[in-house]
Amino acid sequence: MNKFRKIFKGDPFIWGIVFLLSAIGVLAVYSSTGNLAYSKQEGNTEFYLLRHLGFIVVGLFVMYVVHNIPFKFYSRSSIYLLWLSIVLLFVTLFVGYNINNAQRVIPIFGFTLQPSDMAKVFLVIFLAKYLSKKQQEVDNLQVFIRLLGMILLVIAPIIPENLSTALVVMTTSTLLMVIGRIKTKFILGLLGTGVLLAAMFYFLLMNLDMNKYQHTRMPTWKKRIETYMGTGENTDSNYQQVQSQIAVATGGFWGKGPGNSTQRNYLPHPYSDFIFAIIVEEYGLLGGLLLISAFILLILRALKVVLESQRSFPALVVLGIAVSTSFQAFVHMGVSVGKLPVTGLTLPLVSMGGTSIIFNSIAFGVMLGVSRHIQEEKLKASTTGVGSIQKDEEEDNK
């Protein structure tokens, strides 16, 4: 164990969660990509397994590198990395690849990049930096407006093609502002405005002639909402959720066993959007509870890191990333069991998808880097005193 901790620094429980999610993902992706392999790779069922394994290995390497990077790098580079993400998001709107009727990825060096995955990570780091720097000005309306402006700049290009991701980003950002002690009346005003806009959007969506908007995602959004509310026709969204619920219901307590899923043959994208349903079908309620517990544990370990931190920036970073990752996971699970409308959100570190794996690995690497830094900081405090910690706080806010 001591040798492990010397190599893999930071919170050992977070490392355990990483390895658990990665292992479950490899098994689930291999089981759920059979049809895809026969339709795209002439029956080579190992193709997607090996590709997914390759991304996992690269992701773990990236995670290891990131968790060893000096912590001040995150603070100083956050604004530049966020602006790069924003530029790529707007580029995607014009030259992005069309996947499932949405332009979400762009080609870079022979690979496809989903900038929204990148933006989710770097926005959290930027918000943590800005909130920690402005702790004495959190009651200032200008501080709130600047934060909100940057958040809207990120989600504006995401909304047309990936509304569910935009909602995850907005929810996480709002929670971070609450934790960062932004004035309550500003938060309530934001929530009130959000509810009003959502009501207006729903009214327009239900009453507009969708034939005029076939080139947009609006017909898809309308169908998914109608399916969820039980007022729509028998659509693809309805079919997806029915098949997903069948998978969950037939899994029982112990599951059908690895590789024995039947609903993978009927579910669209069982290796990404509905991978939780396949996991529950094959590994039962026990497997589902294991995954749920892993993400709950992630939040609890993040809270532990926060309580141990004597500085606001690292505390906000680790909690923001943990909440964002877990919230996305719980939304994915809610869709799979029919409690939420179809969103297209993947299960972090489990679903197939190279960009998602890499940027989730970066996110976990940052969390591990924070916990490693706090461990070292506690040791420094015991030998050099609190003054050095106060000096580091000033360095974070530069």
Q: Model-predicted segments: where are they?
A:
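Transmembrane alpha-helix boundary/anchor motif
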Residues: 61, 69, 126, 199, ...
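Loop-to-helix entry and N-terminal half of a specific, functionally important transmembrane alpha helix
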Residues: 304-344, 350
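Interfacial segments of multi-pass membrane proteins
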Residues: 131, 172-186, 261-287, 345-360
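Hydrophobic, glycine- and aromatic-enriched re-entrant/interface helices and adjoining loop segments
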Residues: 99, 105, 191-287, 312-313
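Hydrophobic alpha-helical segments of polytopic membrane proteins
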Residues: 79-80, 86, 142-157, 163-211
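Hydrophobic alpha-helical transmembrane segments
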Residues: 54-62, 282-299
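Alpha-helical transmembrane segments of multi-pass membrane proteins, especially transporters
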Residues: 117, 142-147, 190, 316-324
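Membrane-helix boundary/helix-loop-helix interface segments in multi-pass membrane proteins
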Residues: 1-21, 27-30, 35-160, 333-347, ...
